[in-house]
Amino acid sequence: MRQTLCDGYLVIFALAQAVILLMLTPLFTGISRQIRARMHSRRGPGIWQDYRDIHKLFKRQEVAPTSSGLMFRLMPWVLISSMLVLAMALPLFITVSPFAGGGDLITLIYLLALFRFFFALSGLDTGSPFAGVGASRELTLGILVEPMLILSLLVLALIAGSTHIEMISNTLAMGWNSPLTTVLALLACGFACFIEMGKIPFDVAEAEQELQEGPLTEYSGAGLALAKWGLGLKQVVMASLFVALFLPFGRAQELSLACLLTSLVVTLLKVLLIFVLASIAENTLARGRFLLIHHVTWLGFSLAALAWVFWLTGL
């Protein structure tokens, strides 16, 4: 399909894909909140509540700590922009990556690391002890989850013979030549995506059930709205990454209106399914102690390491 698309069309597809995911983020997070409320036997807020919250926060006054600096003010914008670049790079609605420059696995890992780095650094920049604890937890969680995600994606790259998401997705769409290896990589990557989505028991940095929300403690107004929007967008992007890699069916094979609309509906339903499953899994688990999180993450890394061993042995 790439040969039939000029650069102008790819730019349009990239921007449209990013805007669609950005605008639907409050809906997906609202559905997640509704599922949590129903499983807790509560009525809960409506699925449109997150749109109202963001709109309300944008109208509120923005107050910053006197000790905060540039990092504190940049963080919400970095969260949004880094995830938008990832959203543009995923081969989600069509079989090619609309923004090929951001579709390499190395770029993906660096963008996720950039997201985490600024999120943690903004907490340290405030001088708040609560934000500092949340920042240290975020960095520790990154140390635990990034090797798992990197190794599982590396196994997929070895199977596809390329580190580009487009090639990996299209290779897996044609069939799993190494089924055992792919299944183990799927489990490890799915586990890593679940952790990156910040679901319970891995929401140790945001800690939204606690009195103080970690690095977001000192944010207000438009900054808080952008930060929450960016965190929600990260959840949608991680779910979309899993869909693009392991559920690549239903994408548009040609540039007709019917194919594009069908691809849009099917893909969004797949992302919604991942969100619903993650929300159900989240609400069946209790919040874990932060000091014991590494006992759980080792399981995912073991699956990724086992997938690599299986690839070496040709399984």
Swiss-Prot record:
The EC number(s) this enzyme carries: 1.-.-.-
Transmembrane regions: 11-31, 74-94, 99-119, 141-161, 182-202, 229-249, 257-277, 290-310
Chain ranges on the Periplasmic side, renumbered to this chain: 1-10, 95-98, 162-181, 250-256, 311-315
Ranges in the topological domain labelled Cytoplasmic: 32-73, 120-140, 203-228, 278-289
UniProtKB keywords: Cell inner membrane, Cell membrane, Membrane, NAD, Oxidoreductase, Transmembrane, Transmembrane helix
Protein localization: Cell inner membrane
Protein name from the UniProt record: Hydrogenase-4 component C
Organism: Escherichia coli (strain K12)
